[in-house]
Regions:
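Terminal low-complexity tails and localization/encapsulation signals of metabolic enzymes
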Residues: 54-55, 65, 71-72, 114, ...
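Aromatic-enriched alpha-helical interface/lid elements that frame and gate functional surfaces
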Residues: 65-138
Length: 174
């Protein structure tokens, strides 16, 4: 429902722009099914490209390694290595002795289990705050509870929660 609403908003705005430019109207046809299918993004495209049925991967990204949640000594955080340069930077910071094939994302994808196992062993020994500090400049962030996310200083600064007639509610992000 939420994804469909977001797509509907985009469609309505596009139709309004089209009407403004051409004076003609548009018919919008949107379905929950179509929007849910479009949200499959990487997994669906991988199926179409390879013919292979994707398997459950938890929080892991199907095409990037490492790009998933890892457990630290005090909770979970997400590490999102999106390039070989970020990988190399992390390897240098953590002083990881790794295989040459891991220097490329394709090599890390092929050896996903061993790459992730290596990192799980490292990350479990220190706190999330420690890893955020060590990995500054490399995309990573804690996995928050809903309460932590709502009370986070960024949520507070951005006004993520409104009070309407004494009832707290999520704010419109726009």
């Amino acid at each position: 429902d939420v994804i469909t609403g977001l797509h509907a908003t985009s469609a309505i705005l596009a139709a309004l722009l089209y009407r403004e430019r051409t004076g003609k109207s548009q018919r919008i046809d949107i379905s929950l099914w179509d929007c849910a299918i479009s949200a499959l993004v990487n997994q669906a495209q991988n199926k179409l490209a390879s013919g292979k049925e994707p398997q459950p991967m938890g929080s892991a990204h199907p095409n990037l390694v490492p790009y998933r949640a890892f457990e630290a000594s005090d909770g979970w955080f997400v590490l999102a290595i999106g390039s070989d340069a970020q990988w190399q930077q992390m390897v240098e910071i953590l002083e990881i002795d790794c295989r040459e094939s891991w220097s490329t994302n394709s090599g890390r994808v092929k050896d996903r289990i061993e790459v992730e196992r290596t990192l799980f062993k490292i990350f479990k020994n220190e706190t999330i705050t420690h890893w955020e500090s060590m990995l500054e400049g490399i995309p990573c962030a804690p996995v928050n509870t809903i309460g932590q996310a709502l009370s986070d200083m960024q949520s507070v600064a951005r006004g993520a929660v409104w009070s309407v007639e004494g009832v707290q509610t999520l704010a419109n992000p726009l």
